[in-house]
């Protein structure tokens, strides 16, 4: 039996789509030196090559892919989006605006200088900034801009071509810039990280190990009574000295949870909770032959929960003001916008931040009720909320504004982005509403993006040879300029206008470019995870601004003729 593969793929859109995805994902795993191609560029390259062979896909799949992707971007940004406009977030907002605004301005000027159309210009901007949201925003706006069908098809093809030609240029140049730019300025990044660590009491170790607390029991003997010298637990300050917390006392056979006024007595059995190294710091009066095994005393349910910050008495306060240890709880991690941040007593908590806390189940529940709620341990997605807000986003995208003879619509990209932000924000405030497991969100977002990339590549592949020969050299040079010049402008603005700490500034710059590989290089250079504070500050707002930049450059382009 003979099987014509070309006819088989052309006759089955679903089969063609998944063949493109599988081959593209395999290609994306390849590395050029230390740089991995990535899933997006892998799928795009394969789809362009197959598009040259006149394979095509149903455009409905393309539209659904970008809609799912941009909606999930909004959901991820929602919990921390509005907090960016307050306190230190103003600096991050300005940095993101400078980065995105300067890139859009430079791309527009270069597009006019080289005589490109809006498709090539917007595609070059998206590729140089390694930003799929720019590509999505521009493509959606073009489709709703009322262009003649032949001009629309050409613009969309050029959009894909510009993105494909400049993506690797943007990624590699930013990674190289992240490696060498810190060495070109007079402040050492490691010194800057240590400086802010001293000012804020940070842990500069970028590879800090996290242990679960352990429970051990000790019997109070003459040495321990003498060491306590009649002081109560508050006066002894055992936690301040060692990091261990007295959770229970057995006295005369009765178990009790002590308060700060309790005084240790001869024959007491006490249960201490703390990290392994904290037990090692205990006074020898505790440890020298005094450890006991008491099943009931040690029978505590130590749990680790993720607490979402929500309540007004926690939002806007410093981490140290929560006094978690006073409640017998231990902080393991602080996560903001899916980014792990340093354990910093002076970090100002935002609504939607996630604190990973360990301790006795009852105490952790009490702390969670004070500052927010415990994140749902469920793998079930609230599909009703997902679908309802998706519908709202599509309806918002139908809104059209009329100015004299000129009209433009909000478009699906902006509408779905706004609806996603609202769903993410409401999820951060209501524990049982709109829950989407992070793994499920990542899968839908990544799948939507890959479907979108496959669609644009297949549609643009037929004309890539002609386009490459006409603008290839110009496009690569322009991509390099748009990739690096806004970073330099952003650095000068942050360093000399905002006067930011350099470690925080470089992290914020990489967040404004939404580039995780470059962020890892900055952290390695600083030998600290402190730059993650800046990265988290700009990342959420930058994703939104980049989507709007793709929409805006298409809207203003006709007025620049």
UniProtKB/Swiss-Prot annotation:
GO terms for biological process: potassium ion transport. GO terms for molecular function: monoatomic cation transmembrane transporter activity. Keywords: Cell membrane, Membrane, Repeat, Transmembrane, Transmembrane helix, Transport. It is found in: Cell membrane. The chain crosses the membrane at residues 8-28, 37-57, 66-86, 94-114, 158-178, 383-403, 406-426, 447-467, 478-498, 540-560. Residues 202-288, 292-373 form the RCK C-terminal domain. InterPro entries: AAE_transporter (IPR050144), RCK_C (IPR006037), RCK_C_sf (IPR036721), Transp_YbjL_put (IPR023017), YidE_YbjL (IPR006512). GO terms for cellular component: plasma membrane. It is a multi-pass membrane protein. The keyword Cell membrane applies. Gene3D superfamilies: Regulator of K+ conductance, C-terminal domain. Belongs to the AAE transporter (TC 2.A.81) family. YbjL subfamily. NCBIfam families: PRK04972.1, YidE_YbjL_dupl. PANTHER family: K(+)_H(+) ANTIPORTER SUBUNIT KHTT, TRANSPORT PROTEIN YBJL-RELATED. This is Putative transport protein KPK_3686.
């Amino acid at each position: 039996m003979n099987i014509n593969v070309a006819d088989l793929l052309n006759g089955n859109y679903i089969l063609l789509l998944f063949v493109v995805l599988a081959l593209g994902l395999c290609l994306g795993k390849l590395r050029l030196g230390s740089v991995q191609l990535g899933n997006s560029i892998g799928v795009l390259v394969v789809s362009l090559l197959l598009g040259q062979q006149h394979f095509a896909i149903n455009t409905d799949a393309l539209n659904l892919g970008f809609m799912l992707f941009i909606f999930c971007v909004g959901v991820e940004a929602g919990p921390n989006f509005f907090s960016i406009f307050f306190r230190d977030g103003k600096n991050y907002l300005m940095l993101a605006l400078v980065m995105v605004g300067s890139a859009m301005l430079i791309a527009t000027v270069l597009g006019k200088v080289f005589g490109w159309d809006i498709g090539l210009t917007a595609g070059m901007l998206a590729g140089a900034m390694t930003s799929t949201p720019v590509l999505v925003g521009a493509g959606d706006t073009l489709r709703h801009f009322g262009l003649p069908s032949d001009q629309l098809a050409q613009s969309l093809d050029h959009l894909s071509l510009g993105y494909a030609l400049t993506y690797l240029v943007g990624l590699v140049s930013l990674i190289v810039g992240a490696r060498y730019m810190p060495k070109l300025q007079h402040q050492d990044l490691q010194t800057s990280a240590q400086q802010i660590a001293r000012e804020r009491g940070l842990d500069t170790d970028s590879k800090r190990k996290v242990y679960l607390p352990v429970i051990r029991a000790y019997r109070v003997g003459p040495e321990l009574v003498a060491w306590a010298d009649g002081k109560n637990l508050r006066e002894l300050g055992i936690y301040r000295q060692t990091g261990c917390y007295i959770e229970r006392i057995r006295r005369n056979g009765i178990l009790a949870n002590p308060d700060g006024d309790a005084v240790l007595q001869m024959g007491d059995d006490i249960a201490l909770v703390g990290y392994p190294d904290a037990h090692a710091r205990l006074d020898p009066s505790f440890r020298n032959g005094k450890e006991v095994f008491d099943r009931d005393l040690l029978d505590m349910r130590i749990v680790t929960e993720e607490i979402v910050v929500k309540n007004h008495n926690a939002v806007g306060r410093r981490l140290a003001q929560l006094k978690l240890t006073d409640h017998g709880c231990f902080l393991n991690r602080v996560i903001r916008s899916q980014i792990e941040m340093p354990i910093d007593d002076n970090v100002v908590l935002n609504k939607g931040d996630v604190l990973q806390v360990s301790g006795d189940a009852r105490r952790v529940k009490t702390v969670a009720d004070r500052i927010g709620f415990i994140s749902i341990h469920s793998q079930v997605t609230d599909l009703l909320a997902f679908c309802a807000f998706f519908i709202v986003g599509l309806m918002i995208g139908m809104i059209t504004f009329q100015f004299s003879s000129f009209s433009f619509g909000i478009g699906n990209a902006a509408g779905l982005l706004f609806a996603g932000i609202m769903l993410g924000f409401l999820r951060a405030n209501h524990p049982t509403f709109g829950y989407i497991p992070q793994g499920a969100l990542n899968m839908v977002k990544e799948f939507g993006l890959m479907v979108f990339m496959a669609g644009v590549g297949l549609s643009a592949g037929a004309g890539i040879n002609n386009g490459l020969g006409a603008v290839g050299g110009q496009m690569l040079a322009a991509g390099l300029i748009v990739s690096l010049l806004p970073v330099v402008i952003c650095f000068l603005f942050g360093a000399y206008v905002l006067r930011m700490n350099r470690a925080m500034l470089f992290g914020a710059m990489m967040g404004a470019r939404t580039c995780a590989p470059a962020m890892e290089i900055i952290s390695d250079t600083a030998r600290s995870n402190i730059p993650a504070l800046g990265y988290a500050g700009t990342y959420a707002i930058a994703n939104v601004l980049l989507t709007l930049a793709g929409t805006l450059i298409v809207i203003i382009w006709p007025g620049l003729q």
